[in-house]
Amino acid sequence: MAAGVVFLALSAQLLQARLMKEESPVVSWRLEPEDGTALDVHFVSTLEPLSNAVKRNVPRCIIILVLQEPTPFRISVTSSCFVQNTLTKLLKDRRKMQTVQCATAQETS
């Protein structure tokens, strides 16, 4: 997990640079924590309204975690620090979910 966290810190900075240079970049990484699980992560930049009162757009990005489920998990974020924290949390949550699934499978067999 530690290697994944360091990688996320670097990738968040790269993401911010890419979003500023290109109109609609899709930046993809494959995260492979030490426990052997892997996540394909795609960052997509979009323009979303900041609020109804302020008539201007701000760059944001959508994190799409491509898991084995039919529908990707999406989160709208605004800062690279939040990108890093969110991905770290999702990796932990996924690990917890897999642990529960393994325990359930062992109980039923």
Curated annotation (Swiss-Prot):
This is B melanoma antigen 3. Keywords: Secreted, Signal. Not expressed in normal tissues except in testis. Expressed in melanoma, bladder and lung carcinomas. Residues 1-17 form the signal peptide. One of its GO terms (cellular component) is extracellular region. It is found in: Secreted. Belongs to the BAGE family. The ancestral BAGE gene was generated by juxtacentromeric reshuffling of the KMT2C/MLL3 gene. The BAGE family was expanded by juxtacentromeric movement and/or acrocentric exchanges. BAGE family is composed of expressed genes that map to the juxtacentromeric regions of chromosomes 13 and 21 and of unexpressed gene fragments that scattered in the juxtacentromeric regions of several chromosomes, including chromosomes 9, 13, 18 and 21. Its main location: secreted. Unknown. Candidate gene encoding tumor antigens. InterPro entries: BAGE-like. It comes from Homo sapiens (Human). Pfam families: BAGE (PF08180).
